[in-house]
Amino acid sequence: MKRILIVGAGGQIGSELTTYLRKIYGNDNVVATDVRECKQLAESGPFEVMNALDANAMAEMVSRQKIDSIFNLVALLSAVGEAKPQTAWQVNIGALMNSLEVARQYNCALFTPSSIGAFGPSSPKDKTPQDTVMRPTTMYGVCKVTGEMLGDYYHSRFGVDTRSVRFPGLISNVTLPGGGTTDYAVEIYYEAIRSGRFTCPVPGDVYMDMMYMPDALRACVELMEADPTKLVHRNSFNIASMSFTPEIIYAEIKKRLPDFTMDYDVDPVKKAIAESWPNSLD
């Protein structure tokens, strides 16, 4: 990777990945874009406002900036996707299709993340294997499975260098998430410090896979730098770090903050989503 375009740089992953890539490849070689202004990203390197649903704008950007690698991070997350399923499809798949087409036209490598949300209730719950039944019950999951298949199609049909991992919930001390089912695993730490109490929106006994953000960023770079001839899978690799429940986090925080309390106000949508996902990935 020499000239990198990040599409959706203002989100949870993109905001930190931009900084991470700039440290490795140089500030001027990582072009960040988002549909909204991102002052912090603009201060450290090239940033432009761009709507990922505008195919012509993306093509012009790649051509003008001489991009060789694209990171498409545009997504409406799981809970938001259930509230706005049509919008989620239009945004998630629209941005991906534009990225794939531009990558095909300009011979770019393309990274676009999948998720544990690609699995569903009929997938094995524990140590979910790489290749298994994938019948998600959320629009977010449907988009992720579709994205994996489109990535495979563009690689086999057009030779596009597509790559992807299935991210679990991502835990960051830098950027707050928004609209996801695993958000509680970040919010609980902030509330523990801010107010000493937390109201959890998912049941206390539900396991979900999680990963610390710096590990996720490193995985992105290692995959994109890997020898393409040695990649068994392209869309998409399982990637795992840890699996826990809200009660497990609560107990660990209590060891540091004995006065910390947690209660529950379970969101039925998030509950259904969480219970449809794997407990752990293989």
Each predicted region: which residue ranges?
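C-terminal substrate-binding subdomain of Rossmann-fold SDR/epimerase-dehydratase oxidoreductases
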Residues: 201-203, 209-282
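NAD(P)-dependent short-chain dehydrogenase/reductase
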Residues: 152-207, 213-217
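Short-chain dehydrogenase/reductase
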Residues: 89, 132, 137-148, 178-186, ...
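N-terminal Rossmann NAD(P)H-binding glycine-rich loop of SDR-like oxidoreductase domains
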Residues: 4-24
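NAD(P)H-binding glycine-rich loop region in Rossmannoid oxidoreductase-like domains
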Residues: 52-91
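Glycine-rich NAD(P)-binding loop of the Rossmann-fold in SDR/ketoreductase-type enzymes
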Residues: 50-53, 83, 87-98, 134, ...
